[in-house]
């Protein structure tokens, strides 16, 4: 699992803002730290407490899907700094930031990407690995809730929206 701290958005057809519905208010949201640093640290701490190994940083590449990526796309994502590739997580991270909501992502790694493994990618492999990791992920989420209940998050997630009317 990786507690991602950055993302690259390669989606094309998803709604990506709350501020495009003809609102008089337009927002320009700082995405320097797209995931709440305080919440990320809470997740890392919770993982450590239950001895679940996590990668504490990582750049998530969100691809449109539903197809898997080509080997050339994976190579490009690597060159751009991507560590993990998936089809979820964007636009949620952007929308959470627009609302000033603390948000973080836990990436469960389910398979080697195209070109990094000798056998073809299959959805069955992804489902099997997710099933195998389900208990560990559930335990981590429950521990996060316990730690969050005993913690105070003092971040700037709600302070970085600049808009114009």
Whereabouts are the PLM-identified features?
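Glycine-rich phosphate- or other oxyanion-binding loops that anchor nucleotides, phosphorylated ligands
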Residues: 1-117, 124-165
